[in-house]
């Protein structure tokens, strides 16, 4: 019997808090720092120095994917990063008519260029991407999405497949650019927003198959670091389980140390928020995430 999906409580600040002041100190400018790969790379290195992180993060907002599909973006200021502004679609069918996410044009290309620059300099690059529901939230009113999930699942399957194909090409291009960790978050896909029934179906019918696909395509060349909200949904639907990383017993590594250890050994992690990277955890309590095999589904009928 499938258990309850728990909601992971977000208790960390926004990414903008880590770059306030750094943009000015580096003599970088807005919005160029969000649009130019070289400036992105410079800011990412500066943030790493400021926060004493062991990795570098890109990009500095969560609007790259939606913008690449046509969303209107307000580039904000030094303290408030880019945000989508308004909707460009009124009907779900219009999503299918949008162009593809082109990894060689626009901001995706610049983000990947920044990733490549940093990887070539020996940095461990974490690329943060967002999932389908969050992307759709920048394109269309989510009420239409949730209604479609209930009333027109065939259409929604086409919509989700389109978004998933775009994400697949972006993630594969990221690995080719030297990215070793991909942070995957779909913060809108939660129990409070979607409700347990819709989220359960979305997790089993869309999230799990997509993550299986990405694990196969990426071949563990990069670790996919799941937002714990997504990890909790997988666990609550018995779509995944946790397995100890196998780090040396008796040590207390950071969560970030766990990521670096897991690269090439596990497809996924996600027990804590990415912003908890410096939290120390007993080695035996750092886990990788193992997706349920497709063959296991038949035994639950």
Question: What residues fall within each predicted segment?
Answer:
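Active-site-proximal loop/short-helix segments
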Residues: 63, 72, 126-148, 177-203
């Amino acid at each position: 019997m499938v258990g309850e999906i728990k909601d992971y409580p977000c208790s960390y600040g926004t990414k903008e808090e880590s770059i306030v002041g750094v943009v000015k100190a580096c003599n970088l400018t807005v919005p160029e720092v969000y649009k130019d790969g070289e400036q992105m790379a410079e800011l990412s290195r500066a943030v790493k120095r400021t926060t004493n992180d062991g990795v570098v993060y890109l990009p500095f907002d969560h609007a790259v994917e939606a913008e690449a599909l046509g969303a209107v973006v307000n580039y904000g200021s030094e303290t408030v990063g880019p945000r989508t502004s308004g909707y460009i679609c009124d009907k779900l069918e219009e999503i299918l008519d949008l162009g593809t996410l082109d990894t060689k044009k626009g901001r995706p290309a610049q983000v990947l260029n920044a990733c490549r620059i940093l990887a070539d300099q020996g940095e461990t690059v974490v690329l943060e991407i967002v999932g389908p529901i969050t992307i759709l939230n920048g394109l269309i009113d989510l009420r239409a999405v949730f209604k479609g999930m209930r009333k027109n699942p065939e259409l929604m399957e086409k919509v989700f497949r389109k978004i998933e194909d775009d994400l697949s090409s972006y993630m594969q291009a990221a690995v080719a650019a030297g990215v070793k960790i991909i942070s995957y978050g779909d913060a809108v896909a939660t129990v409070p927003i979607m409700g347990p029934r819709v989220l359960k179906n979305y997790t089993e019918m869309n999230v799990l198959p997509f993550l299986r696909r990405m694990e196969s395509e990426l071949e563990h060349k990069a670790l996919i670091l799941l937002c714990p909200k997504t990890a909790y949904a997988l666990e609550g639907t018995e779509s995944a389980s946790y397995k100890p990383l196998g780090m040396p017993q008796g040590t207390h590594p950071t969560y970030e140390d766990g990521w670096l250890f897991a690269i090439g050994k596990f497809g996924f992690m996600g027990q804590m928020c990415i912003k908890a990277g410096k939290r120390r955890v007993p080695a035996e309590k750092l886990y990788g995430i193992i997706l349920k095999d497709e063959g296991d589904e038949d035994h639950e009928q």
